[in-house]
């Protein structure tokens, strides 16, 4: 795995867990998030950039965990602007870069922060600096999300893909994506039936996995 200690006061950091038989790391760094409106007290997670080789090609990941919904939308837009600057720089350097921006963005796929990043609902009309955001359709059109809050599904956890990933005719390219929903990940009874099965609720151990469901992007070559 790739991990750097970040400035979050609770010790929550971003990391990339990978299979060394599938992916070889060539370079990595943590880019610290700049304070929002000069607030140096509530520092948030940085942006973990991991460059490497997979299936004989260069790929790059930016791992994120944007500020929670306890903060208002402009704080996450601020994070998105910083990631956008990073992706613009990477794609200027290598226009064919297969780049994945991933993590818990604490916003839904159609929210302002994702528009700031340039994450689009559809592949058609994508510009070189934009990303395909398959989760927009999954949430908005299919009603599937990764976390349930007050009876409503949100989809905060996602992987968006640069144009070379979705437009490639050969080599490593996008196939499909899904929210990984299985019975063992879901609360089967009680007040929260149908919600992701948490590890704990308050001080009660629930023996679950997470209050968020995983998302998967499938690639082919």
Model-predicted segments: where are they?
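A long, amphipathic alpha-helix that forms part
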Residues: 73-95
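Second-shell loop/turn segments in exported
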Residues: 2-4, 36-38, 66-76, 101-102, ...
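Metal-dependent phosphoester-hydrolase catalytic domains
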Residues: 42, 89-99, 107-221
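Residues that flank catalytic or metal-binding motifs in active/ligand-binding sites
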Residues: 11-13, 44-48, 57, 79, ...
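Active-site-proximal beta-strand/loop segments in catalytic clefts of secreted hydrolases
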Residues: 2-7, 17-20, 30, 62-67, ...
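Short, solvent-exposed loop/turn and secondary-structure capping segments
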Residues: 27-30, 62, 73-74, 111-115, ...
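Structured beta-strand-rich core segments of catalytic domains in phosphoester-bond hydrolases
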Residues: 1-58, 66
């Amino acid at each position: 795995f790739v991990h750097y200690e970040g400035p979050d006061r609770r010790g929550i950091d971003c990391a990339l867990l990978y299979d060394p038989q599938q992916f070889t790391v060539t370079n990595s760094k943590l880019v610290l998030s700049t304070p929002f409106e000069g607030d140096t007290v509530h520092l948030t997670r940085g942006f973990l950039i991991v460059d490497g080789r997979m299936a004989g090609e260069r790929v790059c990941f930016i791992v994120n965990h944007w500020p929670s919904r306890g903060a208002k939308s402009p704080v996450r837009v601020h994070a998105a602007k910083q990631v956008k600057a990073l992706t613009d720089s990477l794609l200027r350097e290598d226009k064919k870069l297969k780049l994945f921006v991933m993590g818990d963005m604490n916003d839904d796929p159609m929210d302002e922060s994702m528009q700031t990043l340039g994450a689009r609902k559809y592949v058609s009309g994508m510009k070189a600096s934009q990303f395909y955001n398959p989760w927009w359709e999954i949430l908005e059109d299919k009603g599937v999300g990764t976390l349930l809050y007050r009876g409503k599904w949100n989809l905060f956890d996602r992987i968006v893909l640069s144009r070379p990933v979705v437009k490639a005719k050969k080599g490593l390219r996008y196939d499909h994506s899904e929210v990984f929903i299985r019975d063992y990940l879901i609360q089967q009874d009680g007040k929260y039936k149908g919600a992701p099965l948490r590890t704990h609720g308050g001080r009660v151990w629930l023996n679950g996995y997470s209050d968020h469901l995983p998302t998967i992007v499938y690639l082919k070559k």
